[in-house]
From Swiss-Prot:
Keyword S-adenosyl-L-methionine: no
Sites annotated Transition state stabilizer: K42, K252
This protein's pathway: Amino-acid biosynthesis; L-arginine biosynthesis; N(2)-acetyl-L-ornithine from L-glutamate: step 2/4
Catalytic activity: N-acetyl-L-glutamate + ATP = N-acetyl-L-glutamyl 5-phosphate + ADP
Function according to Swiss-Prot or TrEMBL: Catalyzes the ATP-dependent phosphorylation of N-acetyl-L-glutamate.
Major place of residence: cytoplasm
Family as reported in the entry's similarity comment: Belongs to the acetylglutamate kinase family. ArgB subfamily.
E.C. code: 2.7.2.8
Keyword Cytoplasm: yes
Protein name: Acetylglutamate kinase
Name of the gene encoding the protein in the UniProt record: argB
Gene3D superfamilies assigned: Acetylglutamate kinase-like
Amino acid sequence: MDHQACNDTTPARKAPQAAIGQVLIEALPYIRKFEGKTFVIKYGGSAMKDECLKNSFAQNVTLLRKVGINVVLVHGGGDAITKTAEKMGIKSTFVHGKRVTDSDMITIVQMTLAGKVNQDIVRLISEHGGKAVGVSGLDADTIQAVPCHNAETLGLVGEVAAINTAYIDLLCNAGLIPVIAPIGFDDEGHVYNINADDAASSIAIALKAEKLIYVSDVAGIQAHDAILRTISKTQAADFIEQHVITGGMIPKVISAFQTLDGGVGKIHLIDGKCIHSILLEIFTHEGVGTQFIAEQGNDDNQ
């Protein structure tokens, strides 16, 4: 920056400069607190489709890693799987939101998730200065699976049985960002399609993560026409009973508190359609999404 620019003190210039400075100062205690901690981020929804949002996400993840936070990504890719299946003349069928997965479909799932989707995320992070490594859940037994409880209907859809935390820790300790495709296999070598939310939750619990962050298409938990910045287990139960929280949000909320019970520090639900939503949620006092906490009163983003 030249000398003239440094001495530009017009109100129009000073206002944004002051705002930027305030944000950076506000972030400092959070950066100190979270250095060396592990964040598991589930990446999905519109943030995986829009180019601007994809770049914003990659920048956010790279910055987290640069300030000393261990970042573990678990990604979805349902739309990409459906498109690939259509190109191959295979129709996708869903039961209660879960993809029916036969032997042909599991091949497409592997090819799409562990292939193009995973590699695109790794490439994008690398373009923004991060060091990411693609991980299939099959690699080094990262995700060990068992058939889901209604396998007779869903086919090769699995549930997480165990996580190889040693392998993930090895990658994080090397300064890398593991980008994990949610597929796994059982003791007999059968490969399973695993729900990305469930995989992220299991990985966060196994790693004893400080935070699990869901990057989604909703701004957070809505109650009485406003987004709740914080919700406790007691509040959630009351809102479900009062039909304030309804429909598909109920299992998400229940799952979030089960993850908290598993030992994860906090759960965050944020809107992936908001530019830099991860940084704003983690490094500012107000945040931009909803954080789930075990007890009311611990309601800051720390």
